[in-house]
């Protein structure tokens, strides 16, 4: 973290758990970010709790809202309005100046790629049920 701070590299905590996030937020001398995540409106290992979001905002960090439908409450039925509702929820926690868009969308990949993404720690621990089809963009 010291070397990243020294070199001006943004520390992205989107893919790490609560303890690592908290430790990095406390240790870093510069603001850190969740560049692409969702608030815990749906229980998912990659989503962040209100407490985690407040902690990063209190340390002048940034949170990018991910419109990745598997992380959102309605899944494949997520609409653009649902994304706006979730983004508003995020803004109410971290503030307008510390929230943005971090879509986290990957294109031109097959179902095997998305199922690979559903694992944490290699193939040792799935964080969600396997995808039956390639996730879609929000509707509308």
Language model: regions and residue ranges:
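Active-site gating loops and adjacent loop-to-helix segments of metal-dependent hydrolytic enzymes
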Residues: 1, 31, 111-140
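Histidine/acidic residue-rich metal-binding segments in metalloenzymes
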Residues: 1-33, 45-61, 81-97
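Active-site-proximal beta-alpha loop/turn segments in soluble metabolic enzymes
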Residues: 1-7, 32-38, 67-75
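Active-site beta-loop-alpha junctions enriched in small/polar residues
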Residues: 9, 14-21, 37-40, 68-70, ...
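Short, well-ordered secondary-structure micro-motifs
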Residues: 24, 44-46, 75-76, 111-113
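A conserved active-site cap/scaffold subdomain adjacent to cofactor or substrate pockets
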Residues: 57-80
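Short acidic/histidine-rich active-site segments
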Residues: 66-67, 94-116, 131-137
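Short amphipathic alpha-helical interaction segments
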Residues: 75-82, 91, 139-140
């Amino acid at each position: 973290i010291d070397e990243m701070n020294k070199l001006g590299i943004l520390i992205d905590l989107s893919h790490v758990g609560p303890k690592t996030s908290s430790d990095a937020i406390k240790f870093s001398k510069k603001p850190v970010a969740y560049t692409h995540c969702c608030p815990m409106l749906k229980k998912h290992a990659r989503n962040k709790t209100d407490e985690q979001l407040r902690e990063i905002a209190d340390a002048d960090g940034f949170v990018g809202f991910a419109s990745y439908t598997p992380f959102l409450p309605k899944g494949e039925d997520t609409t653009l309005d649902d994304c706006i509702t979730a983004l508003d929820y995020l803004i109410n926690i971290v503030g307008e100046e510390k929230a943005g868009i971090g879509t986290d969308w990957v294109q031109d990949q097959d179902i095997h790629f998305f199922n690979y993404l559903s694992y944490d720690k290699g193939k040792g621990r799935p964080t969600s049920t396997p995808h039956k089809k390639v996730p879609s963009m929000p509707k509308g």
